[in-house]
A protein has these predicted regions:
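Short loop-to-alpha-helix "cap/lid" segments that border enzyme active sites
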Residues: 1-3, 7-144
């Protein structure tokens, strides 16, 4: 069974990465690790250089309740040079952010739109992103 695991790292502490790595190191299926915290992605890659990791990102406001440092690092995407994510999952509602522009034109790694919940949102994103993360919705065009 393929797994997509989001590391919830609300501060600069990356201690949980070791525990997740220990739990997954013998897993035989495919697994993607993603997080809003680029420090956690970097730590996980140090533990498992073959892991596929993704940076969750978007433009943040105070209501997002994210640690201010983590919000800055994540939204700017500038630390991607250190964390080296294999993909970015970006909040398509805030893709006018400077960090998104930089990623598209400088880092050139695959970008997935999150989280798409309607047909209208799907139509908006389908040609602008490399992939789409859906929630409680699957477009009729791609149902097998």
């Amino acid at each position: 069974v393929p797994l997509l695991i989001e590391l919830k790292l609300p501060s600069v502490s990356t201690e949980i990465c070791r525990y997740v790595y220990d739990l997954l190191k013998d897993y035989q299926g495919s697994c993607l690790i993603e997080s809003f915290n680029p420090l956690g992605l970097r730590k996980y890659k140090q533990l498992d250089p073959d892991a596929i990791v993704g940076q969750l990102s978007g433009k943040y406001t105070a209501k997002d309740r994210l640690n201010p440092l983590i919000a800055l690092l994540s939204s700017s995407l500038l630390v991607n040079a250190l964390s080296r994510p294999d993909f970015v999952a970006y909040n398509f509602r805030t893709s006018d952010a400077f960090g998104f522009y930089l990623n598209q034109n400088l880092f050139r790694i695959p970008v997935f739109a999150w989280t798409v919940r309607t047909s209208e949102e799907f139509r908006k994103c389908r040609h602008a992103y490399d992939g789409i993360i859906f929630e409680k919705f699957l477009p009729a065009e791609i149902v097998c």
